[in-house]
Design a protein with these regions (language model features):
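Conserved donor-binding/catalytic core segment of Leloir-type glycosyltransferases
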Residues: 4, 196-215, 221-224, 233-234, ...
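N-terminal strand-loop element at the rim of the active site
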Residues: 10-12, 25-73, 80
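Glycosyltransferase donor-sugar binding loop
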Residues: 40-44, 230-249, 254, 261-267
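Short beta-strand->alpha-helix junction loop in the catalytic core
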Residues: 43-44, 125-126, 159-160, 177-188, ...
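Acidic anion/phosphate-binding donor-loop and adjacent secondary structure
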Residues: 130-133, 176-203
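A short, active-site helix/loop in glycosyltransferases that binds the activated sugar's phosphate group
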Residues: 135-175, 182-185
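Nucleotide-activated donor-binding/catalytic signature segment of Leloir-type glycosyltransferases, i.e.
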Residues: 247-275, 321-333, 337
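Aromatic "clamp/platform" in nucleotide-sugar-dependent glycosyltransferases that forms part
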Residues: 288
Length: 480
């Protein structure tokens, strides 16, 4: 079996790690395709992947700058021939419909029309709060999701699988659940000593993420307000220059409030990332949106506890497989008296109108009311759905209220799991997300595709998938 794996780039990051882990899994299992090449739009800076071909025009590109879909299809085919000696039996393509380069979406449609056997593995979606990406898909929107028995999809989680299945309902393309692998050879970082780095806080609760808006930095400030006995920190600042002013405003806010909180702590110490993790009492999560949810799995493999926010839409798969996340909270509700309701109403209306306009959709009747009521509920106001200004206002008011602080502590109940519980979660991750199992699943899907009886390809556009993601009740002001 010959396989061509395709992605826009192989820079360090999530998809690159998935591709590298796939290769590692096949090497360790001594199973997998006979030949495999990775086709990418940029030179590969790593050394794990042995067979890599750079394809001009595959990298990120705006619609106005992208090459034609036909040209990219031809270049992909030539790159595969050069490496494999023939066209591949399977095209395994990552994030084809994300809107990072409309030529790839179109090239996939052309490969599908030509009868190619394809595995499409979306990690993220242009329809999910990425309106600029959606717009960049341009005319390729109408053929974004090809379907036929010889074209399969692989989803990271049950939510994505369900959304794809509903969007492709009636088609002949199966949608597999393919969770990412977690390598087993992670260092145990549970017992590191802080003596080497006396400048770092001893009571560190580390949020091991780079600062982006959906990571919900304000909730870290709220937790710091409610738990002054702990020192909270995220690891890295933003790389996106447009988010830098917001990031700096949180740094200034934390300083003015006198919080035990450091944003970008990894950039203020000589400690390496593993050393930071080792020094932390616990890892913490406050993100409001994730694709796969690696941050809910990796801490246990390091021998660390995790506390903070759960994302049941993402972690339902994990808990079904034995991972215990019952100690995490699903939401922090604050009393509506802490909110300027008029400001929230205005922010909700502006955000919802903006989102629907960006996606070229008409705002549904009562949409603003539905969105507002999904944020301001009978239980209270969802803190993680507020924008930065509203979050800061809540924190300022909460700091002077013992009753509010007590309520936040009751809801969040931050504490460390004992060694036995950590070990049980570590075992659940090892058993269900191993490289060995991942490699077998991927190769098993390939075999199913090659055994399919090919039929004429049909196409589903982006609109059904957009229907799944775009609804007033899913509005989060941090994602607009």
């Amino acid at each position: 079996m010959k396989v061509a794996i395709v992605h826009y780039h192989l820079q360090p990051g999530g998809v690159t790690r998935v591709i590298e882990n796939t290769m590692r899994a096949w090497e360790q299992n001594d199973t997998g395709p006979d030949q495999c090449v990775v086709l990418t739009g940029r030179p590969y800076p790593g050394n794990t992947l042995q067979q890599v071909q750079v394809v001009e025009g595959l990298d990120y590109a705006e619609a106005k700058d992208a090459i034609s879909s036909t040209s990219l299809k031809q270049r992909l085919e030539q790159g595969a021939r050069d490496a494999l000696g023939a066209l591949p039996d399977i095209w395994h393509i990552h994030n084809h419909s994300l809107g990072k380069n409309p030529a790839l979406t179109g090239a996939v449609a052309e490969l599908a029309s030509a009868g190619a056997s394809i595995l499409l593995q979306p990690h993220d979606f242009a329809e999910d709060g990425r309106a600029n990406n959606f717009s960049n898909l341009s005319s390729s929107k109408e053929r974004a999701y090809p379907t036929a028995p010889q074209i399969h999809y692989a989803a990271l989680n049950q939510r994505d699988q369900s959304f794809l299945q509903k969007s492709l309902e009636g088609s002949l393309s199966p949608v597999h659940l393919l969770a990412n692998a977690i390598p087993e050879n992670q260092p145990n970082l549970a017992c590191s000593s802080g003596g080497k780095f006396p400048d770092l806080p001893e009571n560190l609760f580390l949020y091991p993420v780079r600062a982006v808006r959906r990571k919900n930095l304000g909730e870290l400030a709220l937790l710091s307000t409610a738990y002054p006995e702990f020192h909270f920190a995220n690891s890295l600042g933003p790389t996106n220059p447009s988010f830098l002013p917001v990031y700096k405003s949180w740094i200034d806010f934390a300083s003015r409030q006198g919080l035990q909180l450091t944003y970008g702590i990894g950039e203020q110490t000589e400690a390496s990332f593993p050393e930071l993790v080792g020094l932390a009492h616990s890892l913490v999560n406050v993100s409001v949106a994730e694709g796969f949810g690696l941050g809910f799995l990796e801490p246990w493999t390091f021998g660390k506890s995790l506390c903070g926010r759960n994302l049941p839409e993402i972690t339902a798969d994990f808990t079904e497989l034995g991972l215990n996340l019952d100690h995490l909270y699903n939401e922090i509700y604050v009393d509506s008296s802490l909110i300027d309701k008029q400001e929230l109403e205005q922010a909700t209306a502006i955000a919802l109108k903006k989102v629907y306009s960006q996606y070229g959709r008409n705002l549904p009747d009562n949409g603003i009311i539905q969105a507002y009521n999904s944020i301001c509920t009978a239980e209270g106001v969802k803190f993680g759905y507020l924008n930065e200004d509203l979050q800061k206002s809540v924190i300022e008011k909460a700091k002077g209220s013992e009753l509010t602080i007590a309520e936040i502590r009751k809801q969040t109940s931050l504490h460390l799991l004992n060694d036995d519980q950590i070990e049980k979660n570590k075992y659940a991750v090892k058993e269900n997300f191993s490289l060995q199992m991942y490699g077998k699943k991927v190769f098993g899907i390939y075999q199913q595709i090659t055994q399919a009886n090919p039929e004429t390809v049909q196409f589903t556009g982006c609109e059904p998938m957009l229907d799944r993601f775009l609804c007033p009740e899913r509005l989060n002001l941090l994602r607009v």
